[in-house]
């Protein structure tokens, strides 16, 4: 069965400058647990460009511990952009208040992203990859992914329709190209610019997606 990942407060932070009340977070986590979500991506952990952004943009381990301690069956994670990654933010997954780290990258930074994944895995973090701007993945990018020796360290690789521009046929073509590079678990992150987020997500499930992203009330979709 497909897994569900909620990224309401990470993606939705674009609407609130990554400020949310504790009450909102705990209420959201309760809903996610009741509906058997697997993953909750609570926010970003980005090192650079923090000015004017709230605590869910950088999600220190100390800050999110109060939520992590009451996660019940959820796995709680953070996203880091490759271009905003700093090793000091991720000392050791065994003592950090996260279950997973999702690394977001645009196609031109895939090589650096794979190196970041290796660093995080060596530090005991569970790793996911997110390939942004999926429509612009080129042969050279698929080749990098195919040649990576450590595919198995990534729990899943996400295809992200960053600009909400793909349709179901685009998704099928790109999904199959990525599958051919040797990754067992492929997931999908939609946006709703063309009102296709739901239908594209259903298409991804039919293609065998490992997990699908959602936000409550379509926040920042």
Question: Which role does the model predict for each range below?
Answer:
Residues 156-221:
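Catalytic alpha/beta core domains of metabolic enzymes, predominantly
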